[in-house]
A protein has these predicted regions:
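A generic membrane alpha-helix/interface feature
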Residues: 46, 114, 156-158
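Internal hydrophobic alpha-helix adjacent to the cofactor/substrate pocket in enzyme cavities
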Residues: 116-120
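Binding-cleft/active-site segments that stabilize strongly anionic ligands or cofactors
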Residues: 1-108, 112, 122-125
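Secretory targeting signatures
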Residues: 126-158
Length: 158
């Protein structure tokens, strides 16, 4: 089972009816909190009892100056979480918030990343290699789009 965590205090998760739930399902996973409608808060006890195999956290929602994600740090260092399968197996992953927390064309990138995390044997990649450590500013695609549009406009003028 897989859980997408938006925040850790309180534990805010993506449930049924969210595009994160759809990404998890399309990647071959089962949302550990599929019984929760939309986004919701679950107690620490509920989270521990659910015992997910994978924990996905969004980057950028809690980055330290050193580039660490405080949500991921919470799950890895919280003593009460040490019995959770995802923590025991080091399956707590940071995913770029620009691809997992915003519905749009880049959701395909989230699907690819989640599928790689859940099925590294199929995709031939080490899931920990796909985990970003820096916060994405979200402006990386502007320059190529402008260049493409300029090329199209110049082509039309001829």
């Amino acid at each position: 089972s897989v859980v997408h965590v938006v925040w850790h205090d309180p534990i805010w998760i993506s449930g049924n009816g969210t595009f994160q739930n759809e990404v998890i399902a399309m990647a071959g996973g089962i949302n550990a909190f599929g019984s929760v409608n939309e986004w919701g808060i679950v107690s620490l006890e509920e989270f521990i009892a659910t015992d997910p195999d994978f924990i996905l956290v969004s980057s950028g929602t809690g980055m330290t100056e050193e580039g660490r994600d405080i949500i991921q740090d919470y799950f890895l260092s919280e003593p009460r979480m040490q019995g959770v399968k995802a923590v025991q197996n080091s399956h707590v992953y940071v995913i770029d918030t620009d691809i997992i927390s915003r519905g749009g064309p880049r959701i395909v990138d989230a699907l690819e990343e989640v599928a790689t995390i859940l099925h590294p044997d199929i995709f031939g990649a080490n899931a920990s290699d796909t985990t970003p450590v820096a916060q994405s500013p979200g402006f990386g695609g502007i320059l190529p789009v402008c260049a493409l549009l300029t090329g199209i406009l110049l082509g039309l003028r001829r």
